[in-house]
Regions:
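Sequence-level motif detector for i,i+2 pairs with an aromatic at +2
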Residues: 70, 75, 80-95, 99-103, ...
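Short secondary-structure junctions and interdomain/linker hinges
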Residues: 53, 65, 69, 160-163, ...
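Aromatic-lined, polymer-binding surfaces characteristic
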Residues: 105-110, 114-115, 120-333
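Bacterial Sec-dependent N-terminal signal peptides
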Residues: 1-23
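Short, solvent-exposed loop/edge-beta patches enriched in aromatic
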Residues: 51, 66-70, 80-92, 96-102, ...
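Carbohydrate-active enzyme catalytic cores, enriched for enzymes
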Residues: 288-448, 497-499, 504-505
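Extreme N-terminal leader/anchor segments
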Residues: 22-99
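Non-catalytic C-terminal accessory modules of carbohydrate-active enzymes
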Residues: 392-539
């Protein structure tokens, strides 16, 4: 026991020394607009080149700052789950929660090896640099008052900066989806500094800032390190936005967060403007008129909703909602309605394409967040309160003909019968060759779950598993000799969502010389008849 205590004590002393040894970064002050009245003490100290005094004044300012509100954190009502507490505690010994698919979590060594890659899955390497355990460490610190969490967080934060310098790589190298093509320093940069991961840190470090700023370990010198690093992150996003898709949405929303949460930066207003302009543009490009997102994946549809809503919430609480047009807000609500229609009574969504199942508490939490934006919407209130308040959508069956999602439904409660069919156009990267597939919910159970997805990319072994989950033959649709679909462009021939015999007829040119026509009949809102026709001369 004495040996263990000695090791722990030595470890924390080592961490404390590392934190205290950080050099004050006086260039941080040049990044800020010191003309703001609240920063007059900082400005005066800088004018005298009293950098320690300036850093202390700046830290005092941030510890007492008013006027900036964070919609994702109430410091008076912090809650930590058992899972988050475990992440925080494990992180003290450098066992980092990185990916749910790889449990138990890996240990990255006493001298943290940020390049450790135990399984050649790109997501494992990318997601390490999202630092998912940092915010739980902050919650654990605020709730317990135990300085060990703050000391270790500050140590890991600086350690990451020192071991992951930003150097130039080709933009396309950030998005390579298999292992081993990029060598040397560039290999680590493409993982640590991929714009999506950078944006993730940009967002989450606003929370960590609030949780740790009052800690003795959050020193004036550390503050200058933090601000310089944060500014570097923001500029990297602005200069390396992804070309399209959900990555671009995440990056834009998070640059809005950066500009709103740190208005002291000279470029803060332009950061916010950049993000809002992209979101306003992309919501028109990425969302069909029926409210479906063009990935044609329920999980990424949900992610897009939350991206658009997070930006709105940040705007609401900080007084710039007017920068989003009414059409933007209306589209977000339409997307929520779409999502409500494709989900089952237990709040789970079909695992079409790369979708993940989700869990009830998180889904209810989504509706609760959405209700803050749409407080007068009775059907959002219904799902936010698990049916205790409000009223459900006024119809049952629903068709989204542009994106190709069709729901037969006889109720909204647990004992309902629900079928969701996916039969739409060619989707984006996360969409799978599964046109005509369906899931069926009956009396509290999903009787026909879709295959879902594996991890996204990695070495040959990882890709073998990835491709197994993607293949058409593991979906609930017709195949020829178990080959993947050659074409995914379904056409709706008939959609009749009312009456005692509700009908969907959809066609897709699955293969050369073979068209698949699937007709679904929902009879008396009680049972289904599915008729499959293979039309053509294919052999």
């Amino acid at each position: 026991m004495r040996t263990v205590r000695y090791i722990l004590t030595a470890t924390f002393l080592f961490i404390a020394v590392c934190v205290e040894a950080q050099q004050l970064r006086k260039e941080a002050f040049a990044l800020l607009n010191l003309e703001q009245p609240a920063l007059e003490k900082v400005k005066a100290a800088c004018a005298r080149q009293h950098w320690d005094e300036a850093a202390q004044a700046l830290l005092d300012y941030y510890r007492h700052r008013n006027g900036v509100v964070h919609p994702d954190l109430d410091l008076q009502n912090i809650k930590i789950s058992k899972e988050e507490q475990k992440w925080a505690d494990d992180a003290l010994g450098h066992t980092f929660f990185v990916h749910k698919g790889y449990q138990p979590s890996y240990n990255y060594g006493k001298d943290i090896n940020w390049e450790y890659w135990p399984v050649q899955d790109n997501e494992l390497r990318w997601q390490l640099h999202r630092h998912k355990w940092f915010t739980p460490m902050g919650k654990a610190y605020r709730l317990s008052g135990d300085e060990k969490y703050a000391k270790e967080w500050a140590y890991q934060y600086i350690d990451w900066i020192e071991k992951n310098p930003l150097t130039e790589v080709e933009p396309e190298e950030y998005e390579l989806v298999s292992a081993g093509e990029v060598k040397g320093d560039a290999e680590n940069v493409r993982f640590a500094w991929r714009p999506l991961e950078v944006s993730n840190r940009l967002q989450d470090q606003t929370l960590q800032f609030l949780l740790f700023v009052n800690s003795p370990s959050f020193t004036p010198a550390f503050l200058t390190e933090f601000l310089v690093n944060y500014h570097r992150h923001a500029l990297h996003i602005l200069n390396n936005y992804s070309a399209q898709g959900n990555h671009l949405l995440f990056e834009a929303q998070r640059i809005v967060y950066a500009g709103a949460f740190f208005p002291e930066f000279k470029e803060a207003a332009s950061w916010r403007e950049s993000g809002i302009n992209i979101l306003n543009r992309e919501i028109k490009k990425q969302v069909y008129t029926d409210g479906g997102h063009y990935e044609l994946d329920p999980h990424y549809h949900l992610a897009a909703i939350n991206i658009f809503c997070k930006a709105l919430r940040m705007a609401d609480v900080n007084g710039f909602r007017q920068e989003f047009p009414a059409g933007y807000v209306g589209t977000v609500k339409h997307m929520i309605e779409f999502y409500s229609n494709v989900c089952f009574p237990d709040y789970s969504n079909p695992c079409f394409s790369d979708a993940k199942l989700g869990n009830r508490s998180a889904e209810v939490g989504n509706y609760q967040d959405w209700l803050k934006i749409f407080p007068d919407c009775e059907w959002i209130r219904y799902y936010a309160t698990e049916g205790r308040e409000g009223s459900p959508l006024s119809y049952l069956s629903h068709g989204a003909l542009d994106s190709g999602f069709f729901t037969f439904r006889n109720g909204w409660k647990q004992d309902a019968t629900v079928m969701v069919v996916k039969a739409g156009p060619k989707g984006e990267w996360h969409c799978q060759p599964d046109n005509g597939t369906f899931e069926l919910w009956f009396n509290g159970r999903n009787l026909f779950p879709d295959s879902g997805s594996y991890v996204y990319a990695g070495d040959d072994e990882v890709m073998k598993l990835r491709n197994w989950f993607r293949q058409t033959s593991v979906h609930n649709t017709l195949t020829l000799d178990e080959k993947n679909l050659q074409t995914t462009e379904s056409v709706t021939r008939l959609w009749q969502p009312e009456g005692n015999e509700q009908i969907l007829v959809t066609e897709n040119p699955h293969y050369e010389d073979l068209k698949h026509r699937r007709s679904v009949f929902f009879v008396d809102q009680a049972y289904f008849v599915i008729v499959d026709e293979a039309v053509g001369n294919a052999r």
